[in-house]
Amino acid sequence: MSWQTYVDDHLMVDFEGQGQHLAAAAILGHDGSVWAQSPHFPKFKPEEITNIMKDFDEPGFLAPTGLFLAGIKYMVIQGEPGAVIRGKKGSGGITIKKTNQALIFGLYEEPVTPGQCNMVVEKIGDYLVDQGY
């Protein structure tokens, strides 16, 4: 299965048949290389990925400044140290799951809920960890 298939078929899913999807999703390498992405995934800066990786290595690193992706600031909210970072901005937010080799990104806007975003991002992340990725 291609990385793009994981994004298209497992991250950009229709929640409960309601026609609701994540706003954007992507799978990146730890170095910030894009393995696959949805059409609306934002153009990020390399230093933003560096800072995200630093927060996985040093949980709490992003809390004082916020998480930035494509220049957009998200307030960091509860996550799983070293495994999941979650952020909130207005009626939307972001979930990032770290695997051995990849970062799984999900961005959402209402009516999609934080829980729905967390579920799909973390589910595919856990699957990839089980597969050695």
UniProtKB/Swiss-Prot annotation:
Q: Give the domain of life.
A: Eukaryota
Q: What is its main location?
A: cytoplasm
The record's listing under PROSITE patterns reads:
PROFILIN (PS00414)
Record GO terms (molecular function): actin monomer binding
Q: Which SUPFAM superfamilies match?
A: Profilin (actin-binding protein)
Q: Which InterPro entries match?
A: PFN, PFN_euk, PFN_sf, Profilin_CS
Per its UniProt record, what Pfam families does this chain match? Profilin
Q: Which UniProt keywords apply?
A: Actin-binding, Cytoplasm, Cytoskeleton
Cellular location(s): Cytoplasm, Cytoskeleton
Record CDD domains = PROF
Cellular component annotations (GO), alphabetically ordered? cell cortex; cytoskeleton
SMART domains the record matches: PROF
Question: What functional role does this protein have?
Answer: Binds to actin and affects the structure of the cytoskeleton. At high concentrations, profilin prevents the polymerization of actin, whereas it enhances it at low concentrations. By binding to PIP2, it inhibits the formation of IP3 and DG.
Cite the PANTHER family for this sequence: PROFILIN (PTHR11604), PROFILIN-5 (PTHR11604:SF25)
Question: What's the family?
Answer: Belongs to the profilin family.
Listed under subunit, the entry gives: Occurs in many kinds of cells as a complex with monomeric actin in a 1:1 ratio.
Q: What is this protein called?
A: Profilin-3
